Every structure is written in structure tokens, then in C-alpha cells.
């Protein structure tokens, strides 16, 4: 009789997170929170998202359908859940953290064309599933420091029963077979709905969801029961029996006051302890020092600050997920709660509209975006805030709108972006040289922007240099357009300072007004929100929230900002009260 195959106990463990009954149960936050707990126990954890859509990446998808595109350090356009992973694990991930059906099929078809399958009939099994497995197992490779992860948490997108998810679930099943059951863990998230007329929690949807998962060969090791209230022990015992799961693996996760409370909820239910026992992982007790400090800042703020986010996609808050999380983290830094005011950019085109929307806020954030819709409203919001000393932070497109507004204020009345008006006589924002083919339709749009981390050099004693406490920084980018250097001198007449550029001085990365002219009006071509962490707020957002708190505390009349006419004569704006 042949010897039984043995799997090394020191192998990287693989934990898969699946979902059933309905989508949007919080698989990503559940996996991120569990990853945070395992990290706090001294383990090396990395994460991955498997997305079952045919797009190669979300870069060309409508923000209303998909939410934000999260850009990694290496320039990959990924799912917003990757942002949750980075924020909860407090580590940078790469493009390999997001795998889509489009990537898998593109790779397999390319290999077939190269003849790598030696004449085989290319099929979903084994060729597609093998490609998926290779992406999953590659996450166990050592990082740049030679450290191999103890645990890889892989979230399988979609819902059990979806046709699109089947190849990913089959690949996950095969991974368990290859690495050994003792090195693999399946965590299934399911809905336990509350029926108000009968006053009952219903377990049948979870039973059917687990039955569907078992029908394709996967027996979950633990269940996350999502509900608006605690699931009582009697129902947990029933679910454990009917779904053949250890009672220790049946986890009640009622809605939490904050996403940052979820690790505490999972720890209270002892999920992390169950996982480390089941996978035979070395561990220590959870170190709550940093997370408890965060929760104190979340739940016991000393003051409140109101920030207006003037955007184009405000009907879906996920379109600005990293921005809102970075703003909240900036508030945590100051022991302050950030109240979001969602403002449709179209509402701010006229000064009266901007006044109605922004009169009682303490700061204005202009986020990124694409296309002409709502642009004049963003510019109108900047103009309103500039004339009243209201703190402003512009991101990517926000910087470009700040530059356009400054140019118009000194008489360049036709100032615009080549993106919004290709025929503008004054393209103060122009197409980057290496992006012209893509803009003209002569090259692919997907994956061709200026993506990923790029360095910038900051002017000493500038607002941004003081915020960063450095003159050399690196931020992530996602854009095709840049400030037109031919207009720099004329725009500078407005007082706008180009306080940060690429190392060669060519590309404008940061702009600001001197503090004597405006307390805080700063723009960056980058997306600093992508590097913010709840426990390590981004310095630019911390500085912005600090300026907003100062503005609120002063309760002053807005400062008089000199408006430059094209002939160089100053025109003072009439001061107006905040209210």
C-alpha cells in the first residue's frame, strides 16, 4: 500500500472567504478584519480578491456600477476591497491581489495561441482552473524581504450559485486538495434574515446556501452569520447541526457601529482562536494596543468637523470610498469626528448655489473623476471657498480644477482642460505626451494611464512640505492630463504656487496658495487617499482636517482675498458671513 501523502505543517495556510444568499454581505470587511486579528497575533498575512467579471480590471468600469478603482503601488487598477485589505492589514499589496475572469481567460487564450498547451483541447477544467490556482498559490511566495506569509486570505467574489463564480470555487476546492485539508480553511458568509411579522430569525437561506456550496465539493469550516441583531445560541446550534459545522465555527456578526468594530466582534465570537487552532498556527494573544486607541478616537471624538465632498458620483458613496476613509482617518488624528456633506458638483456652478451648499461647512474636498459633467460646479466650489478662506483639498482632477479657477481669476477667461474642451484656446491642462494615442482612440484605454507610485519633490517651507515633514515624497497616480507648463508663469500671477513637481521639474504634482493669501487651499495630482490607514492617517488629510478645525474654531468672517484682474489691478471680494 503506497504511503499517504504528507503536507508540510510549516506550509502557508490558505483561507477562502465565500458568500451566499445575497451579495454585499461584507466578505471583504470580514476577511480584512480576520486578517487584522491574525496580524495582531503576530502572523504574516496577505490577501487576494477573485472577481468573476470578464473585465480585465475595473479601470474602464462605470463608478456607479463598481465603485472606486483602487490603485496599488505597482500601478494595478483593482477592486475597492483591496483598499480594505491594505487599510486593515496596514501593508501595501500588489496587482496580484486582484484576479479577474478577464485576466484568467486572456492569459489562457494567449498561452493557447503560443502553443503552450501542446495541442490539448483547452477547457474550463483543467486549463482555466489551473490558471486560477497558479494565481492563488503564487500569493504564498516570499515578499521583497524574503518573508513568506503564514496565511493567505482569498475572497471569492460573487455569490455561491452564480455561474460566473463556479471556476473560482472549483479552483479553491482543488487548492484544498493540493495543499492538504489541514492547511486550508473555508469561511462562508451568509444572511440570517429577521422576519418582522413573525418576530423570527430564519436559518433556511443559510442551510440552502451551504447545501449549494457542498454540492460543488466544498464543506465550510466556519460560518459568518450576517444579521441586524445577535443570533441566539439555540439558532447557532441548529445551524451547526444542519450545516455540519463545529459550533465553535458558527459566528454571529450583527451590524456594528463602525467597520473598525468588526475585529472586536469576530474576536468576541472567538473566530481568530478557532482559525489558529484549526490550522495549527503559532500565535500569541491579540495585541489590542493600537486598535483600542483607534476605537477610542472613533467613538469618543472631542469635536466634530463638517466637510463637503463636491463630486460627480455622490449617489454611490463607494465611488469615493478611500477618500471618505482618509477623511475620517484625518479626523481620528485630531480626535475629531468628520461629518460628510455630499454635494453634487452641478449644484455649485453659480455662486448662489455654492453658497447654499457650502455656507455651513468647515472644509471642501474636490475628488478625482473623468469627463466634463459637473466640472464647472467643481470650479465654482473652489472659487467660492477661495474667496472666503474656506479650506480646500483637491485630488487629481481637483488640482486641475484649482489651476483652471486660478487661471480664470487672472484674466485667462478661456482657461480649460483639453479633456473637457479639446478646442479651448487656453488649455491650461493638457494631455500628457504619452497619453495622446489613447485619448485619440488609437490605443487601448484600459490600463494605459499614468498609474502607480511616482516620486515628487516639494518646495521647502511650503504647506505640503510642512504637512509631510519632508521634501521628497511618493504618491500613487491615475491620470492622463497634466498642468500645461506654458501657462505656469501667468497662473502664478494669481498667487497659486507650484509647490511640488516631479524630480525633473516637468510635471506639476502639488499646488497651493501661500498661507498669507489663503489658510489652506492645496491640490495634488496624486491620490494620497490610497495610502491612508486608520491607524496612520495620511499627513495631507491630517493637515486638511486640522485646517478645517482651525476654520471652525476661529468663527471668523471670511478673509478678503484679492482678486487679480487681467490688467493686474486688485479687486477685493466683498466679505460674507459663513451662514
Curated annotation (Swiss-Prot):
Binding site for Mg(2+): 81, 155
UniProt-annotated binding residues for L-glutamine: 369, 397-400, 419, 480
Keywords for this protein: ATP-binding, Glutamine amidotransferase, Ligase, Magnesium, Metal-binding, Nucleotide-binding, Pyrimidine biosynthesis
Alphabetical GO biological process terms: 'de novo' CTP biosynthetic process; pyrimidine nucleobase biosynthetic process
Pfam families to which the protein is assigned, alphabetical: CTP_synth_N, GATase
Pathway assigned to this chain's UniProt record: Pyrimidine metabolism; CTP biosynthesis via de novo pathway; CTP from UDP: step 2/2
Binding site for CTP: 23, 162-164, 202-207, 238
Keyword Magnesium: yes
Protein name per the record: CTP synthase
Highest classification ranks of the organism: Bacteria, Bacillati, Actinomycetota, Actinomycetes, Mycobacteriales
Gene designation per UniProt: pyrG
Amino acid at each position: 500500500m503506497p504511503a499517504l501523502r504528507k503536507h508540510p505543517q510549516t506550509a502557508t495556510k490558505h483561507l477562502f472567504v465565500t458568500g451566499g444568499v445575497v451579495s454585499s454581505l461584507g466578505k471583504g470587511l470580514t476577511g480584512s478584519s480576520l486578517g487584522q486579528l491574525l496580524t495582531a497575533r503576530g502572523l504574516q498575512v496577505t490577501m487576494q480578491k477573485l472577481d468573476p467579471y470578464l473585465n480585465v480590471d475595473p479601470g474602464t468600469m462605470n463608478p456607479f456600477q463598481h465603485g472606486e478603482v483602487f490603485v496599488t503601488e505597482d500601478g494595478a487598477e483593482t477592486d475597492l476591497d483591496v483598499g480594505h485589505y491594505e487599510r486593515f492589514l496596514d501593508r501595501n499589496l500588489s496587482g496580484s491581489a486582484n484576479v479577474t475572469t478577464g485576466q484568467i481567460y486572456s492569459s489562457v487564450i494567449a498561452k493557447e495561441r503560443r502553443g503552450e498547451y501542446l495541442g490539448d483541447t483547452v477547457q474550463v477544467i483543467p486549463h482555466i482552473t489551473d490558471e486560477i490556482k497558479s494565481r492563488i498559490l503564487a500569493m504564498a511566495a516570499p515578499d521583497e524581504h524574503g518573508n513568506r506569509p503564514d496565511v493567505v486570505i482569498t475572497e471569492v467574489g460573487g455569490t455561491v450559485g452564480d455561474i460566473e463564480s463556479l471556476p473560482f470555487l472549483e479552483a479553491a476546492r482543488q487548492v484544498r486538495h493540493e495543499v492538504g485539508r489541514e492547511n486550508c480553511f473555508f469561511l462562508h458568509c451568509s444572511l440570517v434574515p429577521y422576519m418582522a411579522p413573525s418576530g423570527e430569525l430564519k436559518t433556511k437561506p443559510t442551510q440552502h446556501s451551504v447545501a449549494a456550496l457542498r454540492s460543488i465539493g466544498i464543506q465550510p469550516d466556519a460560518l459568518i452569520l450576517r444579521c441586524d441583531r445577535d443570533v441566539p445560541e439555540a439558532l447557532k446550534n441548529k445551524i451547526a447541526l444542519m450545516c455540519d459545522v463545529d459550533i465553535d465555527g458558527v459566528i454571529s456578526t450583527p451590524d456594528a457601529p463602525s467597520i473598525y468594530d468588526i475585529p472586536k466582534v469576530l474576536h468576541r465570537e472567538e473566530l481568530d482562536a478557532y482559525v489558529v487552532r484549526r490550522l495549527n498556527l503559532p500565535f500569541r494573544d491579540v495585541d489590542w494596543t493600537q486598535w483600542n486607541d483607534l476605537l477610542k478616537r472613533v467613538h469618543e471624538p472631542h469635536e466634530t468637523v463638517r466637510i463637503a465632498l463636491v463630486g460627480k458620483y455622490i449617489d454611490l458613496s463607494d465611488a469615493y470610498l478611500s477618500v471618505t476613509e482618509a477623511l475620517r482617518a484625518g479626523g481620528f488624528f485630531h480626535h475629531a469626528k468628520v461629518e460628510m456633506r455630499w454635494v453634487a458638483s452641478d449644484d455649485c456652478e453659480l455662486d448662489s448655489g455654492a453658497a447654499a451648499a457650502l455656507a455651513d461647512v468647515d472644509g471642501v474636498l474636490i475628488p478625482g473623476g473623468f469627463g466634463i459633467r459637473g466640472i464647472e460646479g467643481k470650479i465654482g466650489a473652489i472659487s467660492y471657498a477661495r474667496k472666503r478662506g474656506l479650506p480646500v483639498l483637491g485630488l487629481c482632477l481637483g488640482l486641475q480644477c484649482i489651476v483652471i479657477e486660478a487661471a480664470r481669476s487672472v484674466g485667462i477667461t478661456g482657461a480649460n482642460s483639453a479633456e473637457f474642451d479639446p478646442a479651448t484656446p487656453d488649455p491650461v491642462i493638457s494631455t500628457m505626451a504619452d497619453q495622446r494615442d489613447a485619448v485619440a482612440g488609437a490605443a487601448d484605454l484600459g490600463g494605459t494611464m499614468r498609474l502607480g507610485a511616482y516620486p515628487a519633490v516639494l518646495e521647502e517651507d511650503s504647506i505640503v512640505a510642512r504637512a509631510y515633514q519632508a521634501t521628497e515624497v511618493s504618491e500613487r497616480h491615475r491620470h492622463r492630463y497634466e498642468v500645461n507648463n506654458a501657462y505656469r508663469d501667468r497662473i502664478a500671477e494669481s498667487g497659486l504656487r507650484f509647490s511640488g513637481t516631479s524630480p525633473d521639474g516637468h510635471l506639476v504634482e502639488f499646488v497651493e496658495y501661500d498661507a498669507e493669501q489663503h489658510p489652506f487651499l492645496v491640490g495634488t495630482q496624486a491620490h494620497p487617499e490610497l495610502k491612508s490607514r486608520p491607524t496612520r492617517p495620511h499627513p495631507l488629510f491630517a493637515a486638511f482636517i486640522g485646517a478645517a478645525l482651525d476654520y471652525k474654531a476661529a468663527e471668523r468672517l471670511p478673509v478678503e482675498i484679492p482678486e487679480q484682474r487681467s490688467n493686474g489691478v486688485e479687486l477685493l471680494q466683498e466679505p460674507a458671513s459663513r451662514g
